[in-house]
Structures are given as structure tokens and as C-alpha cells.
Swiss-Prot record:
Subunit architecture: Heterooctamer of four alpha and four beta subunits.
Coiled-coil regions listed: none
Record: active site: S25 (schiff-base intermediate with substrate), Y58 (proton donor)
Protein name per Swiss-Prot or TrEMBL: Aspartate 1-decarboxylase
Gene that specifies this protein: panD
Amino acid sequence: MYRTMMAGKLHRATVTEANLNYVGSITIDEDLLDAVGMLANEKVQIVNNNNGARLETYIIPGKRGSGVICLNGAAARLVQEGDKVIIISYQMMSDQEAKSHQPKVAVLDDQNKIEQMLGQEPAHTIL
């Protein structure tokens, strides 16, 4: 049996832009993608901490070191600049792989710089 497991997460990313007239997707700083193992065109889930909205889209790599987190197309209707979002990628794996799998979690500061890297979900609240 295969399970869908969290592979990577950008926790508390700050939306830097919402571009309604761009072809759909999310643009993410390529340094952040590398840190959590996400790839261009990969499907991701986005959770908006400000309004509870959840959506799925795909990744477009953004300029390295820019801190860009830009929701494009229709997704721009579900966020505002400054909103805090969680961006999650998933991976299918066997039960055996899942037992030892360690997702990569990056906790971001207000400028979308990595504040902390976690090997798994913390058992405490991160503000």
C-alpha cells in the first residue's frame, strides 16, 4: 500500500504579492524550494492562516534570495499581501518508507527567511 505523506512545508510564509492577472500558480523563492525539497511545477497545498482558505496549485520558481511568495491567477482572490500561509508538498511512498520518512519543514520569519529547520512537525505552537 502507498500513503500520501507530507514531504516539505514552508511554515508561516508571508505573502509578498497577489497577481490576479497572471496565469495560475504560486511563485516561491528558489532558495526556499531547495530548503524543503520542492520542485518547479510540483503540486502544493496552500493554507491561509488569516482567513482559513485552502487551495491547491503548482510551483513557479522565483528569484533566489528574494523572499517572494506570490499567489497568481484565481488563487490571488484567496489571499492578501501580508497574509501568513503554510505551503505543503506531499509524496507517495510505501508503508515501509513512510515509517522512517522525515519531512523537511522550514519555519520562516516575516521576510520569508528561514528562521528554523525542523525534521518533523513540532509538538508545540510556533508563533
